[in-house]
């Protein structure tokens, strides 16, 4: 076997591989003999059919199969010999496949980029300094009560936290516009669902009133035809409701799994959950900044084959989220996933290089800690831990999670880290970058 390596611009590689004709012909002959021995032919006893007849009937298809197998096998031998690491499946192009002549074919593929990590000491990380305070727990209790709240009609003017039922018709320059009309619309005030000024104009009005309000759509409004436009809304207020929050009774508290029914018990459980969520949020915020810095400091070429693979994964996940079957769901445009897919591939390659450079191995104690922490959110943590420990595939996934955490820790040790005090709600409500 002869191999010629052609290095093109970027990550593309071409191998021209030559396989002696004798290798092909011997393999074809051996396969035809198997067919002659094992297949029944009319007019001939088993194994007695003439080879010429067998070759005439099956020679073409057998040769095609053999060529495919030979190209695949010799490609693998070639990349091992040349110490090449392909990033995806090759494309084979026959150059000379004439019978009786040496097989010559070209294999085209991409390789993984050679990565030399740089700028790790330039990664800037702002570590949130935050804790769950008593007032945060109190606010969370109020949130839980609001989730269980009821509404009742009141004969009073609407307030900033009322729920109102309205009809409205919107118009611009006297003309109604699409999406600007509704009947029996229930609006919980104070949640910023409407454009600025809309809810303010309802405050102080009572059921049965009809009025007109003047507002201006924000410049950043999602509908292009409404951005920055002045509009009028004719409103009929049908109903005003006030929110009634449940008391912190034993019955209410029991809904959250606090068996002793005490307020202190509920506070303890709520604080525990908040601290668990906070820990994950802090970890996630730090990880996000570390990865952003790593990508910013290391501009690498990315194999298109890996991006294509990741796009397919994201497509399947999207189909599942929408409750569909990937096979029966129309293929979503690759443009929807391309940027995210490339980011994932870049991060994966760079983290892989960190693991290699730092010679990291999954810390089994960390693996156990990750599983234990995750299991603590379930009713029976011991059962969850046992389930993971008995499933090798899931344990392998957890080892990968631990390994990634160790890589983040290694990068964090080299990064420029500062601390910034932040409130619980500010951190938890901070949008992802």
Swiss-Prot record:
GO molecular function: peptidyl-prolyl cis-trans isomerase activity; protein folding chaperone; ribosome binding
Record-annotated PPIase FKBP-type domain positions: 161-246
Catalytic function, reaction form: [protein]-peptidylproline (omega=180) = [protein]-peptidylproline (omega=0)
The organism's place on the tree of life at top rank: Bacteria
Gene Ontology biological process terms, A to Z: 'de novo' cotranslational protein folding; cell division; chaperone-mediated protein folding; protein transport; protein unfolding
Gene3D superfamilies on file: 3.10.50.40, Trigger factor ribosome-binding domain, Trigger factor, C-terminal domain
Major enzyme class: isomerase
EC numbers, comma separated: 5.2.1.8
Keywords: Cell cycle, Cell division, Chaperone, Cytoplasm, Isomerase, Rotamase
GO cellular component: cytoplasm
Compartments (UniProt record): Cytoplasm
Pfam families, alphabetized: FKBP_C, Trigger_C, Trigger_N
NCBIfam families: tig
Family listed: Belongs to the FKBP-type PPIase family. Tig subfamily.
Function: Involved in protein export. Acts as a chaperone by maintaining the newly synthesized protein in an open conformation. Functions as a peptidyl-prolyl cis-trans isomerase.
Domain commentary: Consists of 3 domains; the N-terminus binds the ribosome, the middle domain has PPIase activity, while the C-terminus has intrinsic chaperone activity on its own.
Name this protein carries in UniProt: Trigger factor
UniProt lineage: Bacteria, Pseudomonadati, Pseudomonadota, Gammaproteobacteria, Vibrionales
